Amino acid sequence: METPIIPSSSSLDRSGNSSNLLSVIPFQERTDSIIGCHFTLEIKAYHPDMMKSSEEGDVTLGSLYQGIHHIIRNKECQGLILGMDATHENKLHILALAFLCVIRKYEGKVSTYIERSKDTFSGVEQLLARIHIGDDHLGTYDPEVYQICGVEVPQGTYQLTLRTVLTPHNHTDGLSITLGIIVNSPARGMQGRSPMGVDVKRLILSFPKGTDPWTSYGEIKDKKGAVSKLKSILF
């Protein structure tokens, strides 16, 4: 895990002068936001091979991103909910942004809270891997604070839930994924807390070959309940 990036002040620093920012982001392109995130990532494996891979930690966030990217690109997303505004493009942007934070936090592994069980009705055995970062009092503070390098996030609270099923090649039933996200911009209650730095360009290079995420970063813009159309994000 890298050393957290320390902001030059408690407010959003958009000057690009902080010596702590990673040099991979060119000076003229730096637009940094300090956001707070709550995550719930739940992965259920049904196929024996996928259950074994989950137990051994072989299922990575990168491989999940590859499957999610494929589904989004083919417009097969189900269960997307966004609180701030309802445009499809903005949902994908927030999903990708939050997923970068998840990858940054867990460095690819999802083998947390592993439990085998049987479905109450069908009797089918399944394996549950669940990651949760959060608190019951979500309006009080953000349990994880991130400094996002290169992507500006307008002020507001974004709520997103993605539920989908990924079916691996030659498997009749594979992984069921629920990704629940709350993003607060700016982060709340962060006095004395150092945000973790999320270097968008570095993380994009770590994604599996062929996913081609964020070929253009685009922007998120407030426009009275709508946002400008994003440019090639996740497509």
From Swiss-Prot:
Main localization category: virion
InterPro entries, alphabetized: Viral_M
Keywords: Apoptosis, Host membrane, Membrane, Viral envelope protein, Viral matrix protein, Virion
Highest taxon in the source lineage: Viruses
Gene Ontology molecular function: any one: structural constituent of virion
Topology versus the membrane: Peripheral membrane protein
Keyword Nucleus appears in the UniProt entry: no
Other comments on record: Most abundant protein in the virion.
Function of the molecule: Plays a major role in assembly and budding of virion. Completely covers the ribonucleoprotein coil and keep it in condensed bullet-shaped form. Inhibits viral transcription and stimulates replication.
Name of the protein in its database record: Matrix protein
Phylogenetic placement of the source organism: Viruses, Riboviria, Orthornavirae, Negarnaviricota, Haploviricotina
